[in-house]
Amino acid sequence: MARVEALSIVDALAAELRQRVFSGDLTHSDALTEAEVARTYEVARPTAKAAIEKLVGEGLLQRSAHKTARVLQLGPDDVRDIYRTRAGLESQVLRELARNNVVPADAVAANSEIATLTDGAPLSVVEPDMRFHTSLVDAAGSPRTSRIFRTLVSEVRLCMVQVQGKHLLTTSSIVAEHRQILEALADGDGERAVAVLTGHLSRARERLAAALGSEPEPAAAPPDPA
């Protein structure tokens, strides 16, 4: 494999490993060692170690006492914790945006992209869907909040890979609910935006938890539209 070329070799190598995790090329069954990474990408072992540690810090890899790293295996309880944390963080963001009738252009663009993917593979929707939500959080203008949210997004993508991109929500329902959130922001109605978000995330949360082997919790939100 060709040597990775970038201004920051550690960042470039971490980005390559991260993409392999998100594509499903690296799974929990694959042992990842500093020596293997150094040999594969023709980098020094300290560089390989730094790249692996970067993904450990992001919650994508975990390391054993013998320094072997593996993709983190998430379970139903992890999924519920991730999504409930997301819901709390995003709800506060929506209230702040609604106070000033802020409708982020990047969120509008991401939702328009999702609308074109009605026949695409489930995983093809994940990237623009995450971009929609990330754009909302970034619009709040808090670097720390954005940094925390990106960690959650990485874990959500990892969950999706584990269930091999099963359809958790229909594309049409995702687009419709995103649009309802944007309309509520434009109207300055933060509580309406939060109500839509809560139903949106709770359905995805329980379907993802069920796909990982859990019995779904009672759903408070209505089913997806046909």
Where are each of the predicted segments found?
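Alpha-helix N-cap/helix-start motif at coil-to-helix transitions, marked by capping-box chemistry
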Residues: 7-11, 83-87, 101, 108, ...
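A ubiquitous short alpha-helical element
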Residues: 76-79, 94, 98-99, 116-120, ...
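Short, solvent-exposed amphipathic helices
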Residues: 84-89, 128, 151, 200-203, ...
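A short secondary-structure junction motif
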Residues: 20, 24, 152, 156-159, ...
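C-terminal regulatory/effector modules of DNA-binding transcriptional regulators
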Residues: 167-226
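Conserved amphipathic alpha-helical segments that form helical-bundle/coiled-coil interaction surfaces
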Residues: 104-162, 175-184, 192-202
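Short linear motifs at protein or domain termini
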Residues: 1-102, 209-226
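Mobile beta-alpha loop/short-helix "lid" or hinge segments that flank ligand
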Residues: 57, 61-62, 150-155, 170-172
